[in-house]
Amino acid sequence: MLSSYPNWIIALGIVFVVAWLIQLTLQLTVWMRMMRQARRQAQQPAADSSFQPGVSVLVYSHNEAEALARNLPVLLSQNYPDYEVIVLDDCSVDETQDVLKMMEQRSDRFFCSRIDDRTRAMSHRKLGVLLGAKASHHDILLMTHAECMPSSPDWISGMVQHFANPNVEVVLGPVVYERRVSFLSRFCQFDLFNRLLLLLGTTLAVRPYAGWGQNLAFRKSTFYANRSQGFQRHLKLQPGEDDLFVADVARQDNVAVECRPDSLVTDQSKPLFISWSLERLSRGFTSRLYAMTPAVVRVTDSVTRYLTVLPGLALVAYTLYNIINVEGVHQTDWTVMGIALSLLLVRTGLLVYTHYASARALRQRPQLLWPVMLDLYMPLVDVWFRCKALMRRRRFEVGRVGLL
């Protein structure tokens, strides 16, 4: 009988069951939401060819000559009739200018704009977006980076088709890191994919709160209407040209999520770990400015992970100790241990399935062991970068350099 158990074990069991139910709810409603969206969109007909508004692709670049030479031909060969590509060159000192001149000669839809190195009153990335918006000839702006490659020639079509709905002002697209074999690279790949599931899942299930500038589309009219040219509220901060902009303009009814694999963008940043660390640190700083409701979802998910796994393992250990060391009939111990193990296995299986099915929905190679191995570690990574960003918050001000 349960009455034979100490009160602290009973309390631990109650905490375990409640936390497990919360985790189950979050897995089904948030973490699996992107996968269901991708499957639903895959079954929908192709983009309506009658809706093909002009699009301006804004490509931010800083000393990325090699990446531009590799990725610009892909951007300039999209299956879309009316678009232009504008490279925003942030004071590059490598062979970027040579690459840009060559591309200007090859394509009449290619343009470039150089960010003045003397600018100190505004983040160069935000200034680049502002210059790109002013230089663009179309109302639909599609942001990406020089080191990012679209997965297909239909990338623009997939991202832009959502603007057929006049209420849609922002479209969020999926981003993954290029697959590499080293341990650190795979860790970075898993972390970004994990955050992608949470970001898009929370956007679909709760409310939008951020986005990635590697794959982000929005209306130019929305950009200019947002607090005087898009960045007024956080003008003095270096980061925020993508996530804080989305946080400012996004509502539940004006944001669409594109999850088709043809709309995927692969980030080929090198060295990957440094790029990942800088991006993580930047998000650790800007996340404090996100909306409250998504933050509650994120914290609840992190806390209930520990309140599920640790009490569950404690119950298994306690009942196993009783079976081995205490004389008598242990039917209750076996029952409690079986229930605890079953619930833990169900959660683990659901965790692995979510990552596996989501990766397959985006035509990515699944990482089956990483969700289990890093289940309790990833919230600590998040806390680490948030604390580090808080301690170095002055470095995120305009005019400061060096984030790490």
Question: What are these language model-derived features?
Answer:
Residues F163-R195, Y224, S228-R298:
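Catalytic donor/gating beta->alpha subdomain of glycosyltransferases that bind UDP-sugars
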